[in-house]
Amino acid sequence: MIFLEFAELCSRLEKISGRLETISILAETISSLSDDDLPHFCRLILGKPFPEWSGKKLGVGPNLLYEAVAYVTGRKREEVIDRLSRVGDAGAAVEELLSQKSQTSFFTVELTLADIMAALIEISGMEGGRSQKEKVRVIQRILSSASPLEGHYITAILLEDFRIGVGEGNLRDAIAQAFSVDPNLVEYANQVRNDMGEVAVLARKGEEALRSVRLVPFHPVRMMLARQGTISGVLKEGDPVAVEFKYDGARFQFHKQNKTCRMYSRRLEEVTNAMPDVVALLDEALPDDIIVDGEVIAVQGGHPMPFQTVLRRFRRKHNVAEAADAITMIPNLFDILYYNQEMLIDLPFRERRNILTQVASRYVTPQLVSDDETEIEAYYHTALDAGHEGVMLKLQGSRYTPGVRGKDWVKIKPEADTLDLVVTGAEWGEGKRAHVFGSFLLSVRDDDRLVPISRVATGFSDEQLIWLFDTLQDDIIRKDGKMVYFEPRLVFEIGYSEIQKSPNYEGGYALRFPRFIEVREDKDLKEANTAEDVEERYIQTHSSLNT
């Protein structure tokens, strides 16, 4: 596929608001692609050139882009920065600059989808002291051959700011329509393989190929998620439920095969080297050829420590042994996804739990099975007294659904009004905070868009503000007076006293007395709260006030 065709399709899709029309156009394109182009297309149309499990990262920030665009267009770097700041959208700004470039590129070639993917793979593999310069050279090379429209979408992909109105749901249905297969099977295959590119290739082969997908060690899948709820609400399902401690730690997946062990974070990043002590414990406790799901907690003096302690270990690259000696890390296992060449996610939870207790010699989380609300509440208070967050209620007949926040797992913890919001902008501070950001613009997810809902200026320590200022420098994509706007990457946990209707924000709601609690480095943008979540909370709160 010629990349210009891809760019023209993206431009067309951006202008379409109807879901069915989007799916129809995608399906027509997908059905016409070659086997080689099909996986590339399905990854790039989502703005994600690599599967989450691959570990590949582009690591291209605005500063690298400024340098490459300045070279290709024959402009000064400051002119490029000014244009991007004024236009607001980096892709649109690069399109403008390429259409006005003052020098002619020689030896340009017609770019294909495969060319762009090859360049992205090349960029992702660059490490070391010269990697930044090498990345700039690759970006210069592809932009030199790009038309203005191609440059628009190359930029959006490089900055991971690709929003054309196509999400996984639309792509799933388009793949199903293109190859006349059941969309539920496409969804199932993507849960297992976590790669729409691979799933599209399987769908072309037919429904049996989709049904036959299997988990593979060292190919992590998204972790099953829980929704908030109540004990009484879960018990209405009628059957006894499994009750487990909800730990204040960091989620992980542990894979072991042929005596090789790897550990992955909630975001599917490998953390094996950062957690050698935990890996050693699990290696000793578990047999070969296995994938388990769990949560690791930091313990000091017999009591659990805040989960930030674990996250600091996940990020650590140096002095790991000293950190491991300083604080004890304890893994807690609560599910098993694969064992002895058998995928287990389709088994009922009670059966998975039985297998886990049989094969793991240690570290399986305690469990109560009950349909008695009083007994479950007592267990909940036992968890709180032990320093844990609360309890998890799990339906015993439920399958493991990777990446899904459904009704089968419910978390019960003390009432706290918090939201996980995406940081999309900031305003310079005043007084003693004049050299850092003083407040932050926060947004919720609304389909593939981010909609502002609040600003937050309280709850930060001076050290946190300095860290955030340093961390967010390379994410700035636009400046407007005292405001700066970021390529969305960080998620804040925000406390608040009330959700109010407000005309001041696009979503129609605002937070009263918002306060910063912490950076949720364990969560990516897909796990931030949605506009629908906010509306539901508003309705629930005001319904209870009126009864």
Swiss-Prot record:
GO terms for biological process: cell division; DNA biosynthetic process; DNA recombination; DNA repair; lagging strand elongation. The lineage of its organism: Archaea, Methanobacteriati, Methanobacteriota, Stenosarchaea group, Methanomicrobia. Coiled coil: none annotated. Pfam families: DNA_ligase_A_C, DNA_ligase_A_M, DNA_ligase_A_N. ATP binds at residues 244, 251, 266, 295, 334, 405, 411. Its EC number is 6.5.1.1. GO terms for molecular function: ATP binding; DNA binding; DNA ligase (ATP) activity; metal ion binding. Keywords: ATP-binding, Cell cycle, Cell division, DNA damage, DNA recombination, DNA repair, DNA replication, Ligase, Magnesium, Metal-binding, Nucleotide-binding. Belongs to the ATP-dependent DNA ligase family. It catalyses: ATP + (deoxyribonucleotide)n-3'-hydroxyl + 5'-phospho-(deoxyribonucleotide)m = (deoxyribonucleotide)n+m + AMP + diphosphate. The keyword Magnesium applies. Its cofactor is Mg(2+). It comes from Methanospirillum hungatei JF-1 (strain ATCC 27890 / DSM 864 / NBRC 100397 / JF-1). NCBIfam families: dnl1 (TIGR00574). Gene3D superfamilies: DNA ligase, ATP-dependent, N-terminal domain, DNA ligase/mRNA capping enzyme, Nucleic acid-binding proteins. The active site is at residue 246. This is DNA ligase. DNA ligase that seals nicks in double-stranded DNA during DNA replication, DNA recombination and DNA repair.
